[in-house]
Amino acid sequence: MGKLVLYFSEFRNTESIARRIAEKTGADICKIEPVEPYPENLQEVMEIGQNETDNEIMRPIKQLEVDLSKYDKVILGMPTWWYHAPPCVESFLKNAALEKITVFVTNSGIPLNVDDEMKRISPDTYVESSEIIEFTPLVEPSRLVTPLEEIDAWIETL
């Protein structure tokens, strides 16, 4: 059994943290990807993403390239989309039947209550721990706000 960092990242903020966690813990890493990719234009993604989130539209995802049963620890990374988990992550969680999970959430000023969101999406999944990692808004070149030392200290607990 081992660790898996599983993440969804449209603009690479979440991906950068996922890669850091995998590198520092020796975990495997896998990306959650939509069947139909989002456009590359930020404004278009924001419009589509907000519509999906507001209307609770589940975006179909590609089959994962890993077998979740081989891992005793799954670390899920996601950005905040309009105070919620992105539709791709909701699609994953509603079908994954995980007993427990560790969650990290990146945001650019829009917070997410991880416990409430996980109870809403996957009420039978126990959240072992969670971490909120903040970046500057995406409308400018996005930069990490949460100190790396704080992130690394959390990673050491994994």
Feature locations, PLM:
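Solvent-exposed loop/turn segments at secondary-structure junctions
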Residues: 11, 36, 81-83, 108-111, ...
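Conserved strand-to-helix beginnings and helix N-cap segments that scaffold or border functional pockets
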Residues: 15-18, 86-89, 115, 141-144
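Short, glycine-/small-residue-rich phosphate/pyrophosphate-handling segment
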Residues: 102-146
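Mid-chain, well-packed structural core segment of small domains
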Residues: 79-95, 100-103
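Short, conserved loop/helix-junction motifs that constitute active-site signature segments
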Residues: 68, 93-100, 122-125
